[in-house]
């Protein structure tokens, strides 16, 4: 059954249209330079995600937002997300890498859903998201569907 779900998720990623991919890549290009803002929005939306990062666990989010460590880690996360966006629709390798690094950390489906919600909230506040919402929905459904099938 898990194999069937995984196959359907791969099909979903492959089913993204060229217009959807272009829309997602274009809208993300406008914000990917604000890695700190993106990670801040995600941590603010779900503090349990921040707690998974030992260097940030238990610290006041507003006080660490301007630190070099926070910036470096935000750039790493957003850089990987940029790679995924750039690789669309061929993201199987990215998903495998993501799952391999996040499963041992005990990341839950709920936390990933909350990461998604925080990211979407950020996008709504910083882009013309209404025009890209359907494309983002399809893209995030495909990515997280593949991740959940492998976790």
Swiss-Prot record:
Residues involved in heme b binding: 102
InterPro entries linked:
Erythrocruorin, Globin, Globin-like_sf, Globin/Proto, Mb-like_M
User: Additional info?
Assistant: There are at least 12 different components in Midge globin.
Coiled-coil residues: none
Its domain of life reads: Eukaryota
Q: Where is the Globin domain?
A: 16-151
Record text on subunit structure and interactions: Monomer.
**Name the UniProt record assigns to this protein:** Globin CTT-IV
- Any one Gene Ontology cellular component term annotated for this protein: extracellular region
* Protein family per UniProt: Belongs to the globin family.
Q: What is the lineage of its organism?
A: Eukaryota, Metazoa, Ecdysozoa, Arthropoda, Hexapoda
Q: Name one Pfam family in it.
A: Globin
Q: Where is the signal peptide?
A: 1-15
* Keywords noted in UniProt: Heme, Iron, Metal-binding, Oxygen transport, Signal, Transport
Extract one GO molecular function annotation from the record.
oxygen binding
């Amino acid at each position: 059954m898990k194999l069937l779900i995984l196959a359907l998720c791969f099909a979903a990623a492959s089913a993204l249209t060229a217009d959807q991919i272009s829309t997602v890549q274009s809208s993300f290009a406008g914000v990917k330079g604000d890695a700190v803002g993106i990670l801040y929005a995600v941590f603010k939306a779900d503090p349990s995600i921040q707690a998974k990062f030992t260097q940030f666990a238990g610290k006041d989010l507003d006080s660490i937002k301007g630190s070099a460590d926070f910036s470096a880690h935000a750039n790493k996360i957003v850089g990987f997300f940029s790679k995924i966006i750039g690789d669309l629709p061929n993201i199987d390798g990215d998903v495998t890498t993501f799952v391999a690094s996040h499963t041992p950390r005990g990341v839950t489906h709920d936390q990933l859903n909350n990461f998604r919600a925080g990211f979407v909230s950020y996008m709504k506040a910083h882009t013309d998201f209404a025009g890209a919402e359907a494309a983002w929905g399809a893209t995030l459904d495909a990515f997280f569907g593949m991740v959940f099938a492998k976790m």
